[in-house]
Amino acid sequence: ALPPPQNRWDRGRRGPEELSRPRFREVLEHQRKLRREDRFYSLAVFERTSGALVGGASLMDVMRGLAQAAFLGWFVHSPFWRRGYGKEAVRALIDIGFRDVGLHRLEAGIEPENRRSILLARSLGLRKEGLKRRAVFLRDTWVDLGVYAVTCEDVGIPWKGMAKPSPR
């Protein structure tokens, strides 16, 4: 079981309804559907020894056409903080986003006070591009987000060119 939230970004304990096998299967099937539609790609991170869910990373709202971009997000449960899991997952997802999904740009929105996520983003080559004021509704209020982004060229991966529509 997870401990109570450690700060405002920590999701803390989950209710039994969120942890059931049927609910987990439902989430996985929904994610498979979004992946088939080229809209969402995710990685789950598990501890090697215990098999415990450590966290995850996602490419969300994939944009094709002129943008060839996606939003990048991640989370790590508090018992696993400061062990490198987040960095390993986000690094892998950046590589997948550029090499396998064929994206050109990835963007993360990070709350300005979330120093650990900012350090993680910068350590992987994301640069700060600005601030979106009152960008998302979290914890019952509108929250500002720092905009951090990386392109495939920034990390030395050649862009594959415009994605061709997949047959449906």
Say what each PLM segment does.
Residues 1-79, 96, 142-168:
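GNAT-family acyltransferases
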Residues 3-6, 101, 124-125:
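Structural motif
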Residues 57, 72, 106-108, 122, ...:
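A structural signal for short, well-ordered beta-strand segments
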Residues 66, 102-104:
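Short, structured loop/turn "capping" segments at alpha-beta junctions
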Residues 75-76, 82-99, 115-123:
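Conserved acetyl-CoA-binding loop-helix of GNAT-fold acetyltransferases
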Residues 107-109, 127-143:
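Conserved catalytic-core motifs of GNAT/GCN5-like acyltransferases
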Residues 112:
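Catalytic-loop Lys-Pro-X-Asn motif of eukaryotic-like protein kinases
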